[in-house]
Amino acid sequence: TLNTLLLNCMFASGQLKEGEMYDVDFDHQFIETEKYDAKPTYKKFLGYRPGVAVIDDLIVGIENSDGNTNVRFHQKDTLKRFFERFEQNGLTINRFRADCGSCSEEIVEEIEKHSKSFYIRANRCSSLYNDIFALRGWKTEEINGIEFELNSILVEKWKGKAYRLVIQRQK
């Protein structure tokens, strides 16, 4: 496949090395297009929305899906193919990072199998509002030039498994 060729080229050029640990970022990129097979996206334009895996500034996997489906649709399968390809090439995933489109039980279970740790941005959650409101000890951090306050709590979202939820807020 083209993703295999992509990885082979990165190994051949020395941009990736077998046996190394890497941080992987994953997101869906919305691409507006007027092609005949483009589908409406929730962003209100015709286009594609491939899932893209990135190590540093290198695209290490890209897979298209219908523009009008939810970003979680078959995301577990896409990630499983990416992870298996990485592992077949001797790459170890240290940290995996994704946005709230990856915050579902089946996707998190797949990510857990293939990475040392992971960070997934959660949706706003009204059921946790009181717990978050009562938090003390917020730390100020600058992220991409924007100042945020950060804190965390343990939550049991699925089947009694506890995950640390990091909360960020802007003053």
Show which residues each predicted segment covers.
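An anionic, glycine-rich sequence signature occurring as long contiguous blocks
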Residues: S117-K171
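Active-site-proximal, Lys/Arg-enriched surface segment
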Residues: T1-V52
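Short, surface-exposed basic-aromatic patches at helix termini and helix-loop junctions that form
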Residues: E87-Q88, V108-S117
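Short acidic, glycine/serine/threonine-rich loops at helix termini
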Residues: E34-K39, V60-N64, A98, E105-I111, ...
